[in-house]
A protein has these predicted regions:
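DNA-binding alpha-helical recognition surfaces that contact promoter or target DNA
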Residues: 22, 37, 228
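Glycine-rich loop/hinge motif
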Residues: 2-29, 99-105
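Bacterial extracytoplasmic/cell-wall-associated proteins, especially those involved in peptidoglycan
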Residues: 29-30, 43-239
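Short, flexible domain-boundary/linker segments around small modular repeats
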Residues: 1-3, 47-48
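A short alpha->loop->secondary-structure connector
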Residues: 25-41
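Acidic helix-start/capping segments at beta-turn-to-alpha-helix junctions
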Residues: 14-17, 37-46
Length: 239
């Protein structure tokens, strides 16, 4: 008889769909191949997915909620993905949906912002980083000219490595150094704090931030202040 084992799989916040599927395969829950197929081609009955076209596994980016799940192994890819989507559907409350509605944005846009926050923070300052993102989006006449310039978007398109200067030339709508506004969709699956920050950002006049030698985020209104700070921090010196 085939033995079924129970396994707990913890999906870390900020993992991409590809990383989650790799983790599930490594945990013997389901194969990458099946998961990719079911992510790309199955039409899930959730209102938040209805406007996202089928055809690519990345259509679920942002919607596979990071949490600890219990699975019996092996399990069908359809069941596994559906379980994560159900969790997102629970966590993303009616109150949050009303907030999205009121903001004039879509759930997809809010999750895209949340995914940027998730990848840019170490678990602190989410709401202030959210303010920088929205300030840049909402004021295309600022020094930042509507460009988000977020390194994590380069990591999403360069195969997952630490970005280098040349990556800023990659021609992809996810390249926020090249293309203004939000990328086409989330770049990872954000946790609850990042989603909340995307819904309720702080109100600031900040357009820049950088991690200091003290491992704390410092925020700036102008490019000059930002550059001055970078010059004062040993972590940004060459050599």
């Amino acid at each position: 008889s085939s033995s079924k084992a129970k396994v707990n799989v913890t999906i870390p916040e900020g993992y991409t769909v590809a990383q989650i599927f790799q983790l599930l395969e490594d945990s013997n829950v389901a194969s990458m191949e099946d998961l990719n197929d079911m992510a790309a081609n199955h039409d899930y009955a959730f209102s938040f997915l209805q406007d996202i076209p089928l055809g690519d596994p990345s259509r679920l980016e942002g919607y596979l909620f990071p949490d600890t799940y219990e699975f019996t192994t092996p399990h069908s890819a359809l069941y596994v993905i559906n379980k994560m989507l159900v969790r997102f559907d629970e966590v993303f409350t009616d109150e949050m949906r009303a907030q999205v509605e009121k903001s004039g944005k879509t759930i997809h846009e809010v999750l895209t912002v949340a995914s940027l926050i998730e990848r840019e923070t170490d678990g602190t300052d989410q709401k202030r980083i959210a303010s920088v993102i929205y300030n840049r989006l909402n004021d295309p006449t600022a020094e930042t000219v509507g460009l988000l310039q977020i390194d994590a978007t380069l990591t999403y398109i360069n195969g997952g490595r630490v970005p280098v200067e040349a990556d800023k030339q990659i021609d992809s709508p996810y390249n926020t150094y090249k293309y203004k506004g939000l990328p086409p969709g989330p770049i990872c699956n954000p946790g609850l704090e990042s989603i909340k920050a995307a819904l309720s950002p702080e109100k600031t006049n900040d357009y820049y931030y950088a991690l200091g030698d003290d491992n704390v985020h410092h925020f700036f209104k102008t490019y000059e202040e930002h550059q001055q700070f970078l010059r004062s921090q040993s972590r940004y010196q060459q050599g």
